[in-house]
Amino acid sequence: MSIKPILTAEQLTALWQRRAATRAYDPAKKIPDSDFEAILQAGRLSPSSVGSEPWQFLVVQNRELRAQLKPVSWGMATQVDDASHLVVILAKKNARYDSPFFDDIIARRGFTGEAAEAARAKYARFQIHDADILASERSVFDWACKQTYIAMANMMTAAAALGIDSCPIEGFDYAEVNRILAGAGCFDAQEWGVSVMLTFGYRTANIKPKSRKPIEEVVRWIR
């Protein structure tokens, strides 16, 4: 079954050329609800390893919470006050094949009986042998965090397609951000942890052209 392209190759490249990490937003310009819903759907509908979806998206619009996050989040210090939306992406802790979390995955995918047991055996083989991620709680959490970056990238691409700017944020004190948000009742720190953050809005000025390696340096064809 063929799918009719929505964008040409040239339009897609132009979209990526325009997308850039935005450090300053127009505080007077807010993202329409319908557009931001589409961005959230891009995250929700993203692919993840073995269909795990080990994420939650916190949309932090509370100004008091943003003010608390600002001094411990140097990567968004120039953005957090003026960004239309701030999203904190959480990753699931202890997302093991033998956990209740994976029970939900199996049920959601409609597996029962022998099919459910076969699915769990497949997930076990992947986590124990193929990916080898069960050495520690941290290694399982890091695996879950990897999945959140897929969702983050899709959300930024969706935003760019809608003419909305964004910036991925890793520059923050993870322990403090977790403490602030969990302490405010935003999530259960036994079950979830902060993976990465994103700001969204509309840039206030032109951003200098991208500095990227030429494609010949980053792509090798093995024929």
Each language-model region and where it sits:
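Acidic, surface-exposed loops and disordered segments
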Residues: 1-223
